[in-house]
Amino acid sequence: MAAAQRTPVFELHIRPMFRLLDRAHMTTLVTPPIDMWDLDAVWAHRDEILTRLRGSGSLNMPGERVGGPWPAEWITLFERWLATGSDAVPGHHLVLSTPDGPYKVQALAGTRRRLSATVTAPSDGCRVWFALDGVSSGQRDYTLYLEPAFPAQPDDPTPLQAVDPFDKGDAAKLVIRDATGTHDVPVG
């Protein structure tokens, strides 16, 4: 028996298919400009984008001279994502989450550490995690995401753990973005 297909998520599956070049072209060469990395902009222009993805010649996006067109299965994935939304609500996407308490950094063996937070999800079927956004000298940058259940489930607040094990390296702090803002968390 084949496994059920994963519901496409804008930030995980759709946005990464739009390269920096695609974004630059669509924000400078198209009127009105479309920011291909912005959920609301892509949703507002979804029909035009799909027409361009299916198009040929100068209507094709991305153009043949710049690495296009998309493979058919990418277009199918975009269409599957479109089916997860409505005129009122954009397709399936992540939301910034809020931890129930402070972020915790636990020392493990040697230089290993574990970042964790508890999040109360609105229903069963949700997922939470820390997305690693960047690593620079002295810090690691994260975003705390919640993926809502799809299809939506009845309200049933459920505590979930977001965890990221990591090697401390030279990191003195973690910078975590969540629904309440940006937080500096010291690494012990």
Q: What positions do the PLM features span?
A:
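An anionic, turn-rich surface loop/hairpin at beta-sheet edges
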Residues: 140-170
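Aromatic- and Gly/Pro-enriched helix-to-coil junctions and flexible linker segments
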Residues: 1-92
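Mature extracytoplasmic domains of secretory-pathway proteins
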Residues: 111-151
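Transition segment at domain starts
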Residues: 91-120
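A short amphipathic beta-strand at an alpha->beta junction
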Residues: 158-188
